[in-house]
Amino acid sequence: MNTPRNVIAIDRVPVSSLLGYKRIGVNKVKIDANTSWQSLPVKVPARLTINDKIDNGVRIYTAQLVFRSCEELTDLERWVYRCKTANGKYYLIGTDKRPYPVGTVTSNHPDNMTDNQLSEVTVTYTSCNQIPYIL
């Protein structure tokens, strides 16, 4: 039976404040419970896409997180993101080492009052390691 995998919450922490990062196996990590995550106000559900490809004989993993927010998120450099899915898993987008996730913001100013006016944030992260979930 498939369980829902929609992203229902997103938190972030500066890479310098990511405590106790330890990779366990291929696709799991442990993070210190004292890490101070900052909750982001997002329209649920958000979208998380994880894919892989072979580039010059090396497997590269890419995670793309897309969400809408009513707040202007201008500070997008050097953050690590934690995504909670409806099935209870937490995925970690980024680590405390380079390359860091890259974020961009699209600000919507529609000509119709009933159209979407939320900012759309896209966070992209590329790594040679699988995108892990948090234990």
Language-model segments: residues:
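Generic detector of leucine side chains in alpha-helical contexts
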Residues: 18-19, 40, 48, 65, ...
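Oligomerization/assembly interface segments of phage tail-like spikes and tubes
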Residues: 49-72, 115-129
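Short, acidic/charged, Gly/Pro-enriched secondary-structure junctions
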Residues: 70-97
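Sequence-level detector for tyrosine residue identity
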Residues: 21, 61, 81, 90-91, ...
